[in-house]
Amino acid sequence: MNDSSSFPQAETIEQLRQNLATIRERIDQACLQAGRDPQEVRLLPVSKTHPAEYLRLAYAAGCRMLGENKIQEAYQKWQELEDLENLEWSVIGHLQTNKAKYVARFASEFHALDSLRLAQALDQRLTIEDRYLDVLVQINTSGEESKYGIDPEQAPELIAQLAQFTRLRVRGLMTLAMNSEDREAVRGCFVQLRELRDSLQGNAPAGMQLTELSMGMSGDFEIAIAEGATIVRIGQAIFGAREQPDSYYWPK
């Protein structure tokens, strides 16, 4: 549901600040229409493809957490921007088990947990680093084989097993809706994630709240908010259209 041509490149701090304010206003309005408190929804600016020096402008515009898909790109930016106080990183893309050490070293949260093996690798590396990590389990709600995430019916077993990993703080679920102009098909993905989260909450291990729903991007976040999103991942509507096609970051 994204027409990237409608997102002009933000080139100054003021343009970024204005885009952030515009998106926040749209989030607030979507919450009001849904009868929700706007404070329930967090805006996660997604900075993939943009170089570290450009992200200094985003920091100056008010960004204090940035989302990245590719771990090597994220890790390099973290190293280059370590001088920026209180800047946190959220890794939202698929992660290979052998790259868990990088996430454990610097990320504040990870939105794409999709296997017990990856959870174990993260927990081991976090123990070495003496850190903790907020994680969300990625669910494939579209049924598309090309998308990452576990099938919804696998979620109860994985959630139950995650309780053994003391360095992981399981916060909720994440999904990518299908890439479709059919708004109701997109909505169906979000409804499915919310209903799954609600069903899991009643049987979640002690201390596991499962309050977060990470769903919705630049083209569909208002639908996601109407269906219960607590984190919306916004890139192009803040920073401008990306040169790389979505297929570079998300499987088709």
Mark where each language-model region is.
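Conserved alpha/beta-domain cores
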Residues: N2-G219, E227, F239-A241
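Gly/Pro- and small hydrophobic-enriched strand-loop and loop-to-helix capping segments
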Residues: A229-W250
